[in-house]
Every structure is written in structure tokens, then in C-alpha cells.
């Protein structure tokens, strides 16, 4: 069944609303892509509104980490997810989202991009 992101057919009290318009295709949504750590890099290209393309990152083990002290950006290997404020179960499942703290070859880094929407993992190295 499709995900519909329009307004509800009912009020907060439970009474039915009189809808002015019917459901439109533009109000449809998709299930979220949860980016996992894996040796195989897998991307999904999806057509969006306006015939644009969106790259969704499904699996990866690399991240672009920026070192603020040395002003250097490197592509490094991601080993695991240390903390994720989005969902506590994402830590166990190694799901990368924006704001997640990941363990890399350079050290701990905080993810600044949205991998499920951008198709790449960008992160900033945390000073310890």
C-alpha cells in the first residue's frame, strides 16, 4: 500500500472532515532508505517530482571525513556506528543517518549529510 502524506480524513476528536480535494499523486511518499555499513556499495536512483533524479545510498563502508584542524578531507573506511540519536536500535543495526557518530580510520566522526537522500556519507572529525 502506498504511503500518503496528505492531511488526515478525520479531526483530532475523531469527527470526519469534509475533504475539499481528492488524493493527488504529489502527496505520495516512499519508505525511508536506511543506509547500512557493508563491504558492497549499493546506490538506488529514484525519479522525483519534476523528472529529477535522487540518489539513495543503501549500503556503504566509506565516508568523506573533514578534519577541521588540518583543513583536509579524506575518503576513509567506516567500521561501525557508535551513537545515533535518531533511533537507539540503529546502533546495533549499523544504520547511518544524519547526526550519527561513526567510528572511522581517522577516529570518531559526526555525519553531516543525509545518506538516504544525498547518496554520500559526509562527516566531520570530532576532536577528543
Swiss-Prot record:
The keyword Ribonucleoprotein applies. GO terms for cellular component: ribonucleoprotein complex; ribosome. InterPro entries: Ribosomal_eS8 (IPR001047), Ribosomal_protein_eS8_arc (IPR020919), Ribosomal_Se8/biogenesis_NSA2 (IPR022309). Keywords: Ribonucleoprotein, Ribosomal protein. GO terms for molecular function: structural constituent of ribosome. The keyword Nucleotide-binding does not apply. Belongs to the eukaryotic ribosomal protein eS8 family. HAMAP family: Ribosomal_eS8. This is Small ribosomal subunit protein eS8.
